[in-house]
A protein has these predicted regions:
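Structural signature of tandem-repeat unit edges
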Residues: 13-22, 29-47, 58-72, 82-95, ...
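Gram-positive cell-envelope targeting signals
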Residues: 1-5
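Short secondary-structure subsegments characteristic of cysteine-rich extracellular domains
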Residues: 52-58
Length: 265
C-alpha cells in the first residue's frame, strides 16, 4: 500500500508533495460532498493527482471538479468513491490512469480536447463517454470509443450497459483492440468494415449473445481468446487473407467447437 506521508505536507484537506515546482495531491482527507480540487497550493500549480488519492476518505463524495492545471490523473484516483456521481474534467487534463472510476456511481463522462491517453480504456465500458469534437486523440459515436492513430482508428471500448443488438464499426478502423467488446451482454451482430487488419486478444470474449460477425477480406490476424465463451455464435467465415489465428480464438468455449458451429476456413 502507498505510504509516503513522511514526505507529504498538509494544506486544508489535501496531503501533497512538491515535484518539479508543481504539486502532486497524494491524499484527500476532507468530508465535503462537492469537491473542487484547487488549481494552486502555496503558489504552485497542482499538476497531478496521485494513484488512489481519493480512495481512502472519498466514500461520501458526490461530485469532483478537476481544474485545468491538472495534467495527470493517477491509477485508481477516485476508486471506491462509492457515492461519486459526477466527475468534471476541465481543459488541461492529458492522461488518465486505469481504474479511476472503479466502484463509483459515475455513468457519464466528458473528455475535453486535451485528453491524449486513457490507460486500459476498456474499463470504461459502464460509462457513457462524450468526447470533445476537437479532441485529436479520441472520438465516440455514442457506443464505441475510438482512438485516432496515424494508420486509422482503433476501437478501444464499447458501452457494456448499452442494450443495442447490432453495431457497425466505424469506417477507417484498422484495429479492434483487446477487450473492446469483452463481456458485452446484449450485442448479437457486429459488422467490421474493410480495412480492419487485426482483432486483438479477448476482443469479444464472453459476448454470450453474439450470433454473427462479419469479418472482412484484408483481416490478417485474430489473436488469442478473441471469441472465447461466445456460446451463441452461429457461424464464422474466416477471410482468405487471414495469416494468424491465435490460441483458443474460436475454441475452448464450454464444449463449443468450430465444426459444430459452422466455422469455415
Amino acid at each position: 500500500m502507498r505510504d509516503s506521508r513522511k514526505s507529504q505536507m498538509l494544506w486544508n484537506n489535501y496531503r501533497y508533495r512538491v515535484e518539479d515546482d508543481s504539486i502532486v495531491i497524494e491524499d484527500y482527507c476532507g468530508e465535503e460532498l462537492d469537491v473542487s480540487i484547487p488549481a494552486e497550493i502555496e503558489g504552485l500549480p497542482v499538476k497531478k493527482i496521485a494513484p488512489e488519492a481519493f480512495s481512502i476518505h472519498g466514500a461520501m463524495i458526490e461530485r469532483v471538479e478537476v481544474p485545468g492545471s491538472v495534467t495527470d490523473i493517477g491509477d485508481g484516483a477516485f476508486k471506491m468513491c462509492m457515492s461519486l456521481e459526477e466527475l468534471v474534467l476541465q481543459e488541461g487534463v492529458c492522461r488518465i490512469g486505469e481504474n479511476v472510476l472503479l466502484v463509483t456511481a459515475v455513468t457519464q463522462l466528458y473528455l475535453p480536447t486535451t485528453v491524449e491517453k486513457l490507460k486500459c480504456p476498456w474499463e470504461w465500458g459502464k460509462v457513457a463517454i462524450d468526447v470533445a469534437q476537437e479532441n485529436q486523440h479520441y472520438f465516440s459515436d455514442g457506443y464505441g470509443l475510438y482512438e485516432k492513430r496515424e494508420d486509422g482508428y482503433a476501437l478501444v471500448a464499447v458501452r457494456a450497459e448499452d442494450q443495442r443488438v447490432r453495431y457497425t464499426v466505424a469506417s477507417n478502423t484498422t484495429v479492434i483492440e483487446r477487450h473492446a467488446f469483452e463481456g458485452q451482454m446484449y450485442i448479437q451482430e457486429v459488422e467490421l468494415p474493410e480495412g480492419v487488419i487485426s482483432i486483438e486478444e479477448e476482443a469479444f470474449e464472453s459476448c454470450q449473445a453474439l450470433r454473427r460477425i462479419v469479418l472482412p477480406e484484408g483481416l490478417t490476424r485474430i489473436c488469442a481468446d478473441v471469441f472465447r465463451c461466445c456460446i451463441s455464435l452461429e457461424g464464422l467465415e474466416l477471410p482468405s487473407t487471414l495469416k494468424d489465428l491465435g490460441e483458443h480464438a474460436v475454441t475452448d468455449t464450454y464444449g463449443w467447437s468450430p465444426s459444430m458451429n459452422g466455422i469455415m476456413y
